[in-house]
Amino acid sequence: PPPPPSTCRRQRQMCIRDSSNVTTGSVYQAVILKERRGDYLGDTVQVIPHITNEIKARVRRLGDRDDVDVVITEVGGTVGDIESLPFLEAIRQFRQDVGWKNTVLIHLTLVPYIAAAGELKTKPTQHSVRELMEIGLQPDILVCRTEWPLPEEVRRKVGRFCNVDIRDVIESRDMDTIYEVPLRFREQRLDDRIIDHLALSTPDPDLSAWETMVERIKHPGSGEVRVGVVGKYTSLVDSYKSIQEALIHGGIANDVAVRIDWLSSEAIDSQGTSTLEPYDAVLIPGGFGQRGVEGMVDTVRYLREQGVPFLGICLGLQCAIIELSRNVCGLEGADSSEFEPDTPHPVISLLDSQMKVTMKGGTMRLGAY
């Protein structure tokens, strides 16, 4: 049978399933459900061992189900924060369970540059590693975020005070594009160090295609296109991170630079569509609720009448249907039942199967038309 639906992770040739995203809430929910079901036979549920065991089981499940050579596990947050402690303890236990030689711990730290003093400071990295070691985790490799190159003496200092081989102190300097970072890691042989720690045997990588891609990003050969994104949450651009990356990838494929401007649909609703004139194409992404919808509908009408390329995703496509129904099909007052329950023409309506759904999270129907 085909594998379950999965999403290809940006920048990496690997498949990511829903089980690859583990949140604290989902872990606690699973443990509480097991307790209610009687799996713990009346034991008092505790962070250790019940929460940590659930975290470890989720890490192990990925490797067992997909029969992979390596499972990459990222623990977000900052060392020392209470939120990440159960996860770090689970990782400590997991390394003991599978054997230290079968794991490699990479710690991302900050080496800030103090402009007034004209020097890089390693104390944040030292303190971060010390906090991690107090939990029982000794990093094998340190990846140091920095605005400036790390001189040899700074790398030696970090290695000496953090108990790490200087070859395992890796510079992660700010780049023009994030896609250049893997090339800089390769120059420092980060991949070789990981392979050495895990005692694996792999062929040398061929990064020529990646180098070509980075060159296209930095020096596109076919000019620039301006794309406007009209949305409800444009004050926080990360809300549309996947769309932003998809547009950049489209530019790479076509050897053009994509300049993205984020436009508030509420501003268009109140100020008009004149702000749309400079754009070669416009995209309207998804969203929820009535706020800003009329601005999106006005945007669609302007784009249709002016012949500007348009892509509507989720709510964006719903707005296109509403606009077409009102202004082309003559259905006055056409709307979505989500925004106007009493509309005479509900051209967009909630699925019957969703009518009785009251939960907000994890209830959207995906595909299966």
Mark where each language-model region is.
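Beta-strand segments within the central parallel beta-sheet cores of soluble alpha/beta enzyme folds
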Residues: 105, 261, 339-341
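Flexible phosphate-sensing "switch/lid" loops adjacent to ATP/NTP-binding sites
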Residues: 4, 8-259, 266-281, 288-289, ...
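Cysteine-nucleophile active-site neighborhood
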Residues: 275-368
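A short glycine-threonine-serine/GTX helix/turn-capping micro-motif
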Residues: 119-120, 367-369
